[in-house]
Amino acid sequence: MALVVLSLGAVAAKRLQVDNVNPPYWWTGMENDTLQVMLHGDDIRDAAVKVDYPGVSLAEVVRPDSPNYQFLYFVISPDTRPGEMKIDLNLGGRKAVVPYELKARDGKSGAAGFDASDVLYLIMPDRFADGDPSNNEHPAIKNASKVDRNINHARHGGDIKGMLDHLDYIDSLGVTAIWVNPVLENDMPGGSYHGYATTDYYRIDPRFGSNEEWNRFVEECHRRGIKVVMDMIFNHSGSGHPWFEDRPFKDWFNFPDGYVQTNYRLSTLHDPYVSDYDKRRTVDGWFVEAMPDLNQRNPHLMKYLIQNSLWWIESSKIDGIRMDTHPYADFDGMAHWIAEVMRQYPGYNIVGECWYGSEGGEAFWQKDSYVNRKGNSNLPTVMDFVLSIKGRDAFSGQTDRLTGLNDIYDHLALDYLFPNPQNILTFLDNHDTDRFLLSEPDSLGWWKQAMIFLLTSRGIPQIYYGTEVLMNGSRADGGDGNVRRDMPGGFPGDSISVFTAGGRTARQQEAHEFLSRLL
């Protein structure tokens, strides 16, 4: 018996182990016929590769710096039939067979894009509603932190089920699209609630739900005529991503030898007098230490990111993408990414977070910009941060010849800088800024005026969750968490619920009814 066990163990030891395959599957009939498949497993880099599937040819095997990856490039002919191909690996007699599915595109509706006829409702899932308390902790998360609603920067337990449970509420409000803050895995020891430090680009964080639940959420939104905009981050990953400890290529991250923080000076990207040092610090510097900066100049990384976005569009039928920290990533790489998305999905829309305090800075980033002489970003939509900066004082204060609403007039008078002013995402607040209301107002006159302006002026308006019930707060009084507070009634044990008229104060009800009529 001992000899049998030993023999079986020896056979097992000879097998190659592949523990991760990205993308997990793909489709036939895509516009770009080249597919990159990234394999990960101990010492698989130098394995010979063989594939025999009608219509599929292995064009290239890229063996990176790490011994634990392979990048396989396949060409899929237009007449390739759906099915499962087998990728055979052989390293000196140690073998592995990796099944890989090529699906048929299902043709379901969705991936529709969004435009100025839409109104986006921005949700931070962790703070909106906890529909499934059983997933607040998950064994697959190594760096799990406890749910504690008393701590602003802790997880509070909101999830996809919570958003699903309140879709009728969102629908009745009258918005036509939901922008969801990041829901991909964030296996990080701190701050994971906000989702901006991705540790797996193909997996919904299990504390939010599953890939299947996300797909169901999108389907249910579409059934109600509501679009879904997915938040993505290509500038950086989280330091908890397996890439950080086992980098496929030495240049997978910028400043690979250690943490160098960005200078946050986006003006360097269009400054005619900029030094190479300052510009490099802006683009290649890390956003924070827990978010190492990805190097989009590495062609294999860029191909990975492009395919990742296409995979989510095709598998979930999301209608748009909001790209975080867009200008901090490589200009040419991101322009190529957008071109590839538009090639596959003509009429799609992507909005980039281009956080400038000037109209010229924002206009630099819009597709076919009049002021960008360095290249075409291809970015259809930019965000109107100038409006959010000027809005509160303009609407709440006095207006004279130079201030108040004249600031808004002067802002709009500069729309000639933009090739498409209708493709500007307009907002008065979001998850990164102070709430439009720093505290609950004594009267709603100026608040109503601001809502009317937002929803009737040029651009694509966005409303932050809770605006309709006068949620308020400033970052100065408690950091980011103070402007990302829980939606009352979305969590077990809440004593009141603003999801129903009976749970709202008279002033909240007045605001809710007014905004609903506008929408």
Language-model region placement:
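Beta-strand/beta-sandwich contexts
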Residues: A13-R45, L102-D106, A111
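Substrate-binding/active-site clefts of carbohydrate-active enzymes
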Residues: F128-L310, S315, M334-N349, G360-E362, ...
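Edge beta-strands of extracellular beta-sandwich domains
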Residues: K95-K103
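Active-site-proximal helices and loops of the catalytic beta/alpha 8
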Residues: V218, H236, H241-F244, N308-L310, ...
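Hydrophobic faces of well-ordered beta-strands that scaffold small-molecule active sites
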Residues: V119-Y121, I178-V180, V228-M230, I321, ...
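Low-complexity, Pro/Ser/Thr- and charge-rich linker/hinge segments at domain boundaries
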Residues: L102-L122, R127-D132
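Bacterial Sec-dependent N-terminal signal peptides
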Residues: M1-D19
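Immunoglobulin-like IPT/TIG beta-sandwich domains and homologous Ig-like subdomains
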Residues: M30-G93
